[in-house]
Amino acid sequence: MKISDACNHKKSLSFEIFPPKKDSELINIDATLDVLCELQPDFISVTFGAGGSLNCNRTIELAKKIKQNYHVEPVVHLTCLHYNRAEIDEFARILTAEGIQNVLALRGDRNPDLTEKDDFKHASDLISYLKPKGDFCFLGACYPECHPESANKIEEIRHLKEKVNAGAEVLLSQLFFDNTQFYRFVEDCRIADINVPIVPGIMPVINAAQIKRMITMCGASFPERFQKIIHKFEDNKAALFDAGMSYALSQIIDLLANDTDGIHLYTMNNPVVARRICEGIQHII
C-alpha cells in the first residue's frame, strides 16, 4: 500500500524507529515492534543509519520484518549524498523485490568519514532519478524552522517545492517544540502551492542530552515553556520523562485540534513512549 493513499484520506499515525547496531539488540527491537504494531500505526519508518552509514542491510531487514511479520506498511529512509547511481539502482531493485513501495527520500547528513558522490546533491535529485524506475511512493522531509543549511525560509520553501515537484507525495516534518512555528510553516507552504499532506513530527523529551543534540541537528528552537521543563527536571530522569511526555501530548492534542494531517512520532525505539502517547489520544485521532 502506498502511504499517500492513507495520508490523503485520514489523519495518519506513524512511528519512526532505527535499526539496531548490534546483533545483541535484535531481541529488543522485536519486543519494540510487538508493542508498536499492536498500536496499529498507518506506517513505520525505518532510518538508514546515523551519519549516512553505508551499512543499510539492517534497514532493509527491519522493513521486511515489519511488512511480512506484522503486516504494517514500512517506509524506508534512503539517503543519497554518499551513493552513486549504480548503488541507488541496486537498493531500488532490492526494495522492489521485497514489495516495499514507500521511500523517504533524503539527502543525508554530511559525514567527514564518508566520500560525497557527485550523482545526487539533493533529495529532489534522488526522487527524480528513481521515479521512473519503480512503483514507489516518495515521502520527503521538511523543516518547520528551516534546515540548518538553508539561508532563509524563502530558500527553504523553494527547495521543498522542488522536492514536491519531483514527486514527493507526503512530507514528514522534523521535530519541533513550538506549534506556532509549524502552523506558520504550513501556511507558507500552501501559499507556495505545496498542497501535499504535511505530517508534523513530534519527539517527546525524555533525555536532556539527546534532545539538545537533536535540536542542534534539526534547527528547532526552545520555547520558554519548554526551556523551563528542561531546566527544572534535567537532573531527575523520572520527572523529566513524565514532564516531557506531558509536553509532547499537549503538543499533539493541539495539532490534532487544528486539523493537521496526522502525527509522526519519533519513538527513539522506546515502546513506552509510543504506548503512552497513543493512550492519550486514542479517542482523538
Label each PLM-derived region with a short phrase:
Residues 12-28, 74-86, 139-155, 232-246:
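Active-site mouth loops of central-metabolism enzymes
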Residues 41-62, 108-118, 169-182, 268-271:
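Glycine-rich, proline-tolerant flexible connector loops at the mouths of alpha/beta enzymes
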